[in-house]
Amino acid sequence: MTEYKIVIVGGGLVGKSALTLQLVQVCIKDQYYLIEFQNNQFQFENLQNHYIDEYDPTVEDSRREVSIDDQTCLLNILDTAGQQHSNAQSMDAHWSTVFVCLFNYFNITSMYDEIASFREQILRVKDGAKDLVPLILIINKADLDHESQGSGNEGQLAKDSLSFHQSSAKSRINLEEIPYSLVRELRKELKLDQSSGKAQKKKKQCLII
């Protein structure tokens, strides 16, 4: 079974942990609603009561087996929430096969500059091998009122051929589409690499920022 290793990165409070939990269907169920995240704990509410589920993104790993286009694969998702910036910068990881950069509509105005910087650093540690660095952008919290935060950056991202999606971890918007897009992007890259006669095992590195 093919395993796809996914690193989710982004600034503070963009919803990395909530999205990770939703993608692997660990804690958040359809009948519950995420209220807040404080001190590495998620608080959920249903119609009857309140309760607390503990979650530590620095130790929890998240795996999900899925069938995509009649092929079964394993998604292994790394949530970088809680990592200090200095530690992340120096992290030498032979781990990731795809990067997910997460933003929300309240930091969208700085999104393009940040994604460009992140992509540049990935390419540097990947020795400039652009075709080996699948990168997908997710704009989270699509359920919130964001009209006042709008900008023209989405069009620029599309022009630069960056794949991006809108999502909501709370409302489960596009949560099933995202892993399908990730895997299909990876398979597409591998197929192109093989057709060029370049397919070979290479050491993987990633830089988390």
Curated annotation (Swiss-Prot):
Record comment: activity regulation: Alternates between an inactive form bound to GDP and an active form bound to GTP. Activated by a guanine nucleotide-exchange factor (GEF) and inactivated by a GTPase-activating protein (GAP).
General function of this protein: This protein is activated by the insulin/insulin (insulin-like)-receptor system. This transition enables the ras protein to interact with the lectin-receptor/lectin complex, a process which ultimately lead to an initiation of an intra-cellular signal-transduction chain.
Primary enzyme class: hydrolase
Name of the protein in question: Ras-like protein
Phylogenetic lineage: Eukaryota, Metazoa, Porifera, Demospongiae, Heteroscleromorpha
Amino acids binding GTP: 10-17, 79-83, 140-143
Residue ranges annotated as motif Effector region: 55-63
Family under the similarity heading: Belongs to the small GTPase superfamily. Ras family.
GO cellular component term of the entry, any: plasma membrane
Subcellular location: Cell membrane
Propeptide: 207-209
Cysteines joined through disulfide linkages: none
